[in-house]
Amino acid sequence: MANPLISNHHGKNGKYTQAFLEQNGPGDARPTALDILKDNDRIDSMKDKVFLLTGSSGGIGIETGRALAATGGKVYLGVRDLEKGKQALEEILEPGRVELLELDIGSMESVRTAAKTFLSKSTQLNVLVNNAGIMACSEAKTADGFESQLAINYLGHFLLYKLLEQTLLSSSTPEFQSRVVNVSSAGHHMSSVVLDNINLEGEYEEWKAYGNAKTACIWMTNEIEHRYGSKGLHGLSLMPGGIATGLQRHVDPETLKQWGSSEPAQKYGKSSAQGAATTITAAFGKEWEGKGGVYLEDCQEAGPVPEGGTLAVGVAPHAFDPEGEKKLWDLSLKMLDLSE
């Protein structure tokens, strides 16, 4: 019987096709973020570029930050707590080149302050990687009054992007067009965006809220592509894979036990370095130069859920909805009191 956790869309993957088809757990032959950089000749070759990452101090964020630093470019690593960030990222930090940026993505005030700080230090931004996130937590509101999963997974990132949008556009070059990379999740299958009740007032359920926010991440990058792709700014979203990180801290222990109990699930799991590989593909893959509006998994464009598969792989039909994407964009501007 085929492993239901293996995507059936590895025909275009070339070098790693077999590794993805023969999953064997964290640290197997599937590529790491640094492998992807090497494959794309990006090691120490981007010294004139600037990158910003959110959610840098835990899980795949650390490995994504490590890969960004390896490009040779200027890197800003967004962290909620500067002291914890310094401890987690100590071996990556390099004064004047790889720096921490205080950023609590769930606080719109913090996002505005961080964007202002960034712009005071840099007039350039080539890739924005929106990686910070939470998953399946109990219902809570942020200080701004937004549902917390929506605020942290999506709305804070939308605000950060909007505040840096003109810098991304002006930094785009013919040889490397600017990119916005949103780390979404297979959890987008759980729900489309609930446009008429986006904060899920009176209908909150933790997985529905997660799906609502993670589909919003996909819609955001699709709409960036629609609006700005022809101007040299591209949006890509992705599923990093199954990685054991602090992201799961709110998940019911029994659910976690079920997730990890089957052999296919154990083999499906990736290390954090492997989990960051798809993010780095979206950010630096030469096959995505000048392209966007796609959802990636396993370092390539995802196809639909394979027959007999599970919702852990593949992309849901509702992930591409041009009408919904425009409505979400307009709603987000209104919620954040922004104008175009």
UniProtKB/Swiss-Prot annotation:
<dbReference type="InterPro" id="IPR002347">
    <property type="entry name" value="SDR_fam"/>
</dbReference>
<feature type="active site" description="Proton donor">
    <location>
        <position position="184"/>
    </location>
</feature>
<keyword id="KW-0521">NADP</keyword>
<dbReference type="Pfam" id="PF00106">
    <property type="entry name" value="adh_short"/>
</dbReference>
<feature type="binding site">
    <location>
        <position position="84"/>
    </location>
    <ligand>
        <name>NADP(+)</name>
    </ligand>
</feature>
<comment type="similarity">
    <text>Belongs to the short-chain dehydrogenases/reductases (SDR) family.</text>
</comment>
<feature type="binding site">
    <location>
        <position position="131"/>
    </location>
    <ligand>
        <name>NADP(+)</name>
    </ligand>
</feature>
<feature type="active site" description="Lowers pKa of active site Tyr">
    <location>
        <position position="214"/>
    </location>
</feature>
<dbReference type="GO" id="GO:0016491">
    <property type="term" value="F:oxidoreductase activity"/>
</dbReference>
<feature type="binding site">
    <location>
        <position position="104"/>
    </location>
    <ligand>
        <name>NADP(+)</name>
    </ligand>
</feature>
<keyword id="KW-0560">Oxidoreductase</keyword>
<feature type="binding site">
    <location>
        <position position="60"/>
    </location>
    <ligand>
        <name>NADP(+)</name>
    </ligand>
</feature>
<feature type="binding site">
    <location>
        <position position="214"/>
    </location>
    <ligand>
        <name>NADP(+)</name>
    </ligand>
</feature>
<protein>
    <recommendedName>
        <fullName>Short-chain dehydrogenase/reductase prx1</fullName>
        <ecNumber>1.1.99.-</ecNumber>
    </recommendedName>
</protein>
<comment type="function">
    <text>Short-chain dehydrogenase/reductase; part of the gene cluster that mediates the biosynthesis of PR-toxin, a bicyclic sesquiterpene belonging to the eremophilane class and acting as a mycotoxin. The first step of the pathway is catalyzed by the aristolochene synthase which performs the cyclization of trans,trans-farnesyl diphosphate (FPP) to the bicyclic sesquiterpene aristolochene. Following the formation of aristolochene, the non-oxygenated aristolochene is converted to the trioxygenated intermediate eremofortin B, via 7-epi-neopetasone.</text>
</comment>
<feature type="binding site">
    <location>
        <position position="162"/>
    </location>
    <ligand>
        <name>NADP(+)</name>
    </ligand>
</feature>
<feature type="binding site">
    <location>
        <position position="210"/>
    </location>
    <ligand>
        <name>NADP(+)</name>
    </ligand>
</feature>
<feature type="active site" description="Proton acceptor">
    <location>
        <position position="210"/>
    </location>
</feature>
<comment type="pathway">
    <text>Sesquiterpene biosynthesis.</text>
</comment>
<dbReference type="InterPro" id="IPR036291">
    <property type="entry name" value="NAD(P)-bd_dom_sf"/>
</dbReference>
